[in-house]
Amino acid sequence: MEKKSIAGLCFLFLVLFVAQEVVVQSEAKTCENLVDTYRGPCFTTGSCDDHCKNKEHLLSGRCRDDVRCWCTRNC
């Protein structure tokens, strides 16, 4: 009886491990690119994000430490 419960527990961990690996492999890679069309210094990430989504048709955008707008896209 104890061997069955240990085997069942091992099987459950194996299924969970395989399911987690499948999720990790299906994630898309993203890349950041500097935006040439954004004018002025980038202080608010919201305006950069709007620009990247609406004008560049990319995933998102953010202001980085160099006060420039960087857009995120799928690689």
Swiss-Prot record:
Source species, domain of life: Eukaryota
Disulfide bridges in this chain: C31-C75, C42-C63, C48-C69, C52-C71
Entry's Gene Ontology BP terms: defense response to fungus; killing of cells of another organism
Localisation per UniProt entry: Secreted
Pfam families: Gamma-thionin (PF00304)
Key word Disulfide bond present: yes
Keywords: Antimicrobial, Disulfide bond, Fungicide, Germination, Plant defense, Secreted, Signal
GO CC, any one term: extracellular region
UniProt entry tagged with the keyword Disulfide bond: yes
Signal peptide residue numbers: 1-24
Summary of the function given for this chain in its UniProt record: This protein is required for germination.
Family that this chain belongs to: Belongs to the DEFL family.
Protein name: Defensin-like protein
Taxonomic source organism: Vigna unguiculata
